[in-house]
Regions:
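Conserved catalytic cores of very large enzyme subunits
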Residues: 1-170
C-alpha cells in the first residue's frame, strides 16, 4: 500500500539525509486515495496504523527508527481546492476540495491510532506531527485530536497566518 511505501521511503532516506524526513500536506495528498478507492474508516485506520508502527520499528535500517515528521493541513488549503487530485500519478475527475469528508476520516483514524498507543499504551516516538491552523479550524468537533493533545502533548500547532512556515517542513 501507499503507507507501506512511505515507510520504506523514510527508512531509506534516513540513511541518505540528515535530520527529520518530512511529508508536507500529508492529509491533503493522501485523501484522494481514500476518495478514489472509497475506503472505509476501518481500512483507513488499518493503513495508518501500519504506517505509524512501521516508522517506529528500527528493523532493516540499522539501530534507530526513521526520524520523521508529517504536517497536516486539516482543511484542504486554498492552493489545492480547485486542483484536480492526483492518484497513482494520474489526474482524477475530482479536485482536492472534493475530499474534505475524507480529511475528517483520515484525521479521526490517525488520532485514534495515536491515542491507543503501542501494545503497552505508550505513545509513539514518530512521526512528529505538526498541524497547520487556519481561521476555518473547527475547535468544537475534534475530539480525537484533543485527546492526543491531553495524553501525549502532540501535535505541534503552527499557523500560516502569523508567520511564514512554508520553508520549515518541505
Amino acid at each position: 500500500t501507499l503507507c507501506n511505501q512511505m515507510v520504506n521511503f523514510l527508512g531509506i532516506m534516513q540513511n541518505e539525509w540528515a535530520s527529520a524526513q518530512s511529508f508536507a500536506h500529508f492529509d491533503t495528498l493522501l485523501v484522494p486515495f481514500i476518495h478514489q478507492d472509497k475506503l472505509s474508516f476501518k481500512m483507513v485506520s488499518d493503513c495508518l496504523e501500519s504506517f505509524i508502527y512501521g516508522i517506529n520499528i528500527p528493523s532493516r535500517w540499522g539501530t534507530q527508527a526513521p526520524f520523521s515528521q508529517i504536517t497536516l493541513d486539516w482543511n484542504v488549503p486554498q492552493e489545492f481546492i480547485n486542483k484536480k487530485a492526483i492518484v497513482a500519478g494520474c489526474e482524477c475527475d475530482f479536485t482536492y476540495g472534493d475530499c474534505q469528508k475524507e480529511m475528517k476520516i483520515l484525521h479521526d483514524a490517525l488520532f485514534e491510532v495515536i491515542n491507543k498507543g503501542d501494545i503497552s499504551g505508550r505513545g509513539f516516538q514518530f512521526p512528529i506531527i505538526a498541524l497547520y491552523l487556519n481561521p476555518d479550524f473547527d475547535w468544537m468537533h475534534e475530539e480525537e485530536l484533543f485527546k492526543a493533545c491531553a495524553k501525549y502533548g502532540t501535535p505541534y500547532f503552527l499557523t500560516k497566518e502569523k508567520q511564514d512556515v512554508e520553508g520549515y517542513f518541505g
